[in-house]
């Protein structure tokens, strides 16, 4: 029943037979978004990121038989044998002879990307026809199923073998056929639609129907919100790798929400079928099962929330990040290349593979979609004042830790939907409220991210903030805490009354100056831009993990009217607890971020040129095998002939957490001698003088220890650029949308387009290439408590390197207590939230090393 097909394949198969033998019926699938009803009963669709069901679910009664064989990461076949549909329900535009002769017919249509695939003729007994559109059946007898078990089981067997061998390729479509398709929201809308089911070929409301299809037979837009978007960010000052780490936490929230949405949708389907059976006088089924990825239970099928949309993760933009220091050359290049100023996620990582794990989109695409898409609920809000910010979201959510007894005892948390005055009265009488709605004084994290204009308006309208005051002479704000809320407050000026001495009743009385809540304007992390939120939720949880955040969002959104909440902004996403690797592995999210292939290509080029111990003749023969095959055991690790280390300087020097360079040189020579290599690749943010000092120290220590020359290698940008210009026969260019395009003859005179050379000017790009080079080393030594070192260890674990080759860190001093453990002169990082050893061989590893034998082990 399962067929593993390509990741981009989106197939939709409908099986219908015109012979009706008895009263077996199929209820319409009307409650699931993007599925036209009632003519589409079961589909063959790609849902690798939902994984809502973990077993075969069979709901069989006297009037319906449903089979749901579901497996995460595979394409699922859902089939139905039905009688001829009522008139007007289904309209095949080709092969009319099939319907006239009463022969069975099979409609097979595929859609890959923005193009509609051509229709295939499968075999003589079953003709293929292009399926145009469906319209909801308003009356008449529903289609029925055949009651032949042998035919049903035989068909399943035939389809299993047939579909496993069927070549699904990207079919081409003629321009005339493409003109017949009405595009609702452009490429972005079709991409979003492909997350759930194959993109619908429909017209937007008020537009011209499909060519050759009458208006009454065209598919109408469902009057439900198709998607909900979750935007997240982190506090200002965090680096690249923390933002990369937070995506795993928020992605798990998205996965849980979509799994719950799919489960509720199927429960509603079962309820619809049971109600139809009761109306026909049939008894209820004795036993039915519903299941999710974590549990199975009897279907109560009495859901009160009628809509089950798809949740989409919106990746935050890369703005001002710590440790990203732009050179003068980079600043000059930014003025000429706009794409270099705001590099997208698709430039750093393989965005196509990421999209196969969960619904995800870039922040820029999200803004475009928000401006283009029509509101299915009409004008939800009548704004009296002109919108002053380019982006407006429905809700901003902030989550913080709370150890109060009420937070520990509450089984769940939900942000209630009420007017601000009612919420204030309720909070004054109750102590177990876990979420404050539109209560700015009670949410210091949100208050710290206010824009200057919003801060001037906040004290007058909502009673000020107890953690901030205004200088009476300069008018500037004296902030008393950082946005994450975990820092110490600054000392307040003498002569001023501390707002903390004011009672909450006084603050609430001043808050009543403003009759209505008009939203709040906040900075997107890194001061990217101003975003306005129409509603504010501030939740206090004892355990802020992904399941509880997903449950909070589900309950809070379901408590409001349909369509009221479509965009949610998770402020300070780093406050979410880090999920265990086993949980991410079971959710197929552990290895969802692949370093972009072009960046890996640059890293492999650097390794083969500067870090390989092979001679020139061997290098010429095995360069391709090394680049594609990677580390195929200890022998290939030795071929690379280098170890790697991360030496963090700058801020760690002031914190006295950086190892002296002379001691670091002794460490490096000792480890190179231990592993039989003579080169060490060093990742560091130190100055050129520090690099020169370390190189000289390694040479001196190496000469004293052995006659072999020990050297260290740095990722020198000018050297790499000269290497690329000299060796790359074809350069890959980066377009404005962040995607790569191969282009010949990059040295063409007069050409000024962006290429790999200009791409290397970005500090984030070079840092990610260094991570890749260090991850492929035979051994790695990191810096304790550094996110950069942790990112390298993460990549190494996923590649299959043993843990003992990645956990060592530089000993800052001789005390083992400050380094997490010391044995035989070595210090080790704390084993915390690392991928489980023994389960590290994942899809990421197979993606990086396609020629690796799955049966081999490191």
Swiss-Prot record:
Knockout mutant characteristics: Loss of MIC2 O-fucosylation. Nuclear O-fucosylation is normal. MIC2 protein levels are decreased by 50 percent. Abnormal MIC2 accumulation in the early/mid-secretory pathway. The number of plaques caused by tachyzoite infection of human foreskin fibroblasts (HFF) is reduced by 40 percent. The number of tachyzoites that are attached to or invaded the host HFFs is reduced. Egress from the HFFs is also partially impaired. However, another study shows that loss of POFUT2 only leads to a small decrease in MIC2 protein levels and has no effect on MIC2 trafficking and interaction with M2AP.
BP GO terms, sorted: fucose metabolic process; protein O-linked fucosylation
Its membrane topology: Single-pass type II membrane protein
Claim: Amino-acid biosynthesis is one of the keywords in the record: no
UniProt binding sites for GDP-beta-L-fucose: 237-241, 646-648, 787-788
Topological domain spans for side Cytoplasmic: 1-150
Catalysis: reaction(s): L-seryl-[protein] + GDP-beta-L-fucose = 3-O-(alpha-L-fucosyl)-L-seryl-[protein] + GDP + H(+); L-threonyl-[protein] + GDP-beta-L-fucose = 3-O-(alpha-L-fucosyl)-L-threonyl-[protein] + GDP + H(+)
Gene Ontology CC: endoplasmic reticulum; endoplasmic reticulum membrane
Membrane spanning stretches: 151-171
Top-level taxon of origin: Eukaryota
An example molecular function term from Gene Ontology annotations: peptide-O-fucosyltransferase activity
Subcellular location: Endoplasmic reticulum membrane
Catalytic EC class: transferase
Lumenal side: 172-858
EC number(s) given by UniProt: 2.4.1.221
Keyword Cell wall biogenesis/degradation annotated: no
Pathway: Protein modification; protein glycosylation
Region (Disordered): 448-510, 819-858
UniProt keyword terms in alphabetical order: Carbohydrate metabolism, Endoplasmic reticulum, Fucose metabolism, Glycosyltransferase, Membrane, Signal-anchor, Transferase, Transmembrane, Transmembrane helix
Active site: 238 (proton acceptor)
Function according to Swiss-Prot or TrEMBL: Catalyzes the reaction that attaches fucose through an O-glycosidic linkage to a conserved serine or threonine residue in the consensus sequence C1-X-X-S/T-C2 of thrombospondin type I repeats (TSRs) where C1 and C2 are the first and second cysteines of the repeat, respectively. O-fucosylates microneme protein MIC2 and may play a role in its stabilization. Probably by regulating protein O-fucosylation, may play a role in tachyzoite adhesion to and/or invasion of host cells; however, POFUT2 involvement in adhesion/invasion is controversial.
Family to which this protein belongs: Belongs to the glycosyltransferase 68 family.
Protein name: GDP-fucose protein O-fucosyltransferase 2
Provenance organism: Toxoplasma gondii (strain ATCC 50853 / GT1)
Gene field: POFUT2
